[in-house]
Design a protein with these regions (language model features):
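Membrane-proximal transmembrane or re-entrant/amphipathic helices at the cytosolic face
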Residues: 2, 402, 407-409, 431-478
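Membrane-interface junctions at transmembrane-helix termini in multi-pass inner-membrane proteins
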Residues: 6, 10, 67-76, 126-150, ...
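Signature of the first transmembrane helix
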Residues: 5-64, 89-101, 123, 153-162, ...
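N-terminal membrane topogenesis motif
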Residues: 1-28, 66-69, 73-84, 113, ...
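Helix-loop junctions and terminal segments of transmembrane helices
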Residues: 27, 58-76, 138-139, 249, ...
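Interhelical loop/hinge segments that connect adjacent transmembrane helices in multipass membrane
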Residues: 1-5, 9, 144, 187-228, ...
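Transmembrane helical elements of multi-pass membrane transporters/channels
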Residues: 12-27, 174-177, 181, 185, ...
Length: 478
């Protein structure tokens, strides 16, 4: 049993890494070309709509994907109930937002948002037809199939976006990119899952899941507000170009930290839920995931902080130079975001969606207070305050999970701090070794090679178990 779970977890991490890795590589490549063709204003306009699309998506899914994963043996009726509930809720939300579109355009002083938002909001309605299938794939840990589906959706949507941008469609190219991505994603989910909805509609299972899922719904909405509150505020109070520069920085930060968060998050909840009755084993597995997360996250995000200026100048050129300091600041908090993902999955796997909800309510209240206090001081000060708050709030999560799961702070510190300090020392050493280089192409290449070499050597010298296990797994060719 233990060996079976270990093997399943290892394979899940492998395909999760393949999924996240291919996703981020494609996003980076297509993102570079799109950023060269489009302006900060184009990204700013789409960025304003993000919070509305995501909140509507939260309402539409209503936390039932996680609820399905948490059920030991979900039935066809469970999936069917979730399917029809999601479709009906998303249709209602789309109608409401369709008529609210002129109000959104007026609030942000951007008349183009009326027609644009009505089109972009189609994405969450289309998405509702694949929520149950997504829950099925996650429950059955179909990580290989999830990787393939995401890959095809990314290729299709980005090619469409790139062609439209090349033909002068401006922000409409980003809108079409979003809609096509969701459409292809759903087609792939239907192709790989054997389950199909039927017209025997029974909302009984939804009612049973509601107590658990409603807390996730509230929390997901709060998470969305938390992650996008700065874009919303910037869109209201600052020029659209400033919003675009922040959106670009936030996108690159998210692309990087999502690689780690999605790699681990894809398997964390199903694995932890499967052993929730064995508290000691659950904590042992969680701490191993935590070490793996820290092992990847800190060097990746601190490394991006180090090379962000060269990266932006080389890839998307000088018109985006104003996004560099914002990206450098965001990457510091971005290093901790995958740890948030793990903490959240532990709370959900314990069936404590209330902990998940209240931790995030407190977080968004704190962020709103920061926004009210700091928005008068400019974008950079707001981003610094946001970063510090995100790091500090992790202590609140730790305190709650100590009570819920027995997760001790000293154990977490023992798992995280060595990787954080090694990554920070690596980047400081790399900076001083390479600071005399003037050519930005050479500087980017050398910094990447030097930092990777130093970090790898430190891990080998310290005989870090996570590294040895990763090497052994790759050698087995699985």
């Amino acid at each position: 049993m233990a060996e079976s779970l270990k093997e399943k977890t290892a394979k899940g991490l492998f395909w999760g890494a393949m999924n996240s890795g291919s996703t981020q590589v494609l996003n980076i490549l297509f993102g570079i070309f799109l950023a060269r063709l489009l302006s900060p204003a184009d990204y700013g306009i789409i960025g304003i709509l993000t919070i509305f699309t995501l909140i509507a998506g939260n309402l539409q899914s209503s936390g039932f994907t996680q609820a399905l994963v948490n059920i030991r043996k979900p039935t066809d009726n469970d999936y069917n109930s979730v399917f029809w509930f999601n479709v009906l809720v998303s249709l209602t939300m789309y109608v409401v937002l369709f008529f609210c579109a002129p109000l959104i355009a007026d609030f942000f002083h951007q008349p183009c948002l009326t027609s644009l938002s009505r089109f972009v909001f189609l994405s969450f309605f289309i998405s509702s037809f694949g929520i149950a299938q997504n829950g099925y794939m996650m429950k059955n840990m179909m990580n290989k199939e999830i990787t393939i589906v995401n890959f095809m959706a990314l290729i299709s949507s980005n090619v469409v976006g790139l062609v439209l941008a090349f033909n002068g469609m401006a922000y409409w190219s980003l809108a079409w990119q979003q809609v096509i991505f969701i459409l292809v994603l759903n087609i792939g989910r239907y192709y790989y899952t054997g389950w199909r909805p039927n017209f025997h509609i029974d909302f009984g299972p939804v009612k049973k899941m509601f107590g658990f899922s409603v807390k996730l719904l509230v929390t997901n909405i709060i998470n969305t507000v938390s992650n996008n509150v700065l874009t919303f505020v910037f869109g209201r109070f600052y020029p659209i170009n400033d919003v675009g520069n922040y959106s670009q920085a936030y996108n690159w930060d998210t692309k990087a930290n999502s690689f780690v968060a999605n790699t681990v998050g894809q398997i964390a909840q199903p694995v932890l839920a499967s052993i929730q009755d064995d508290k000691n084993r659950e904590l042992m597995v969680f701490r191993k995931m935590l070490r793996f997360t820290a092992f990847l996250s800190f060097p990746l995000m601190f490394g991006l902080t180090l090379v962000s200026r060269e990266f932006i100048l080389i890839t998307i050129h000088e018109k985006w130079i104003a996004s560099v300091p914002l990206l450098q600041i965001l990457c510091v908090s971005g290093a901790f975001m995958p740890i948030y993902t793990l903490y959240q999955n532990l709370a959900i796997s314990k069936g404590r969606s209330d902990v998940y909800m209240w931790c995030n309510i407190g977080q968004v209240v704190g962020l709103l207070a920061l926004v009210l206090f700091c928005h008068q001081y400019g974008i950079q000060i707001m981003v610094i305050a946001y970063t510090l708050f995100i790091i500090v709030w992790l202590l609140v999560w730790q305190w709650m999970l100590k009570r819920v799961a027995g997760l001790r702070f000293r154990d977490v510190a023992k798992d995280i701090l060595p990787f954080m300090l090694c990554a920070a020392a690596t980047m400081v050493a790399t900076y001083f070794i390479t600071r005399s280089l003037q050519n930005i192409y050479l500087l980017l290449l050398v910094r990447l090679l030097v930092s990777a070499t130093i970090y790898f050597c430190i891990m080998k010298l310290l005989k870090v178990q996570i590294l040895e296990e990763c090497i052994a797994f790759c050698k087995r060719g699985r």
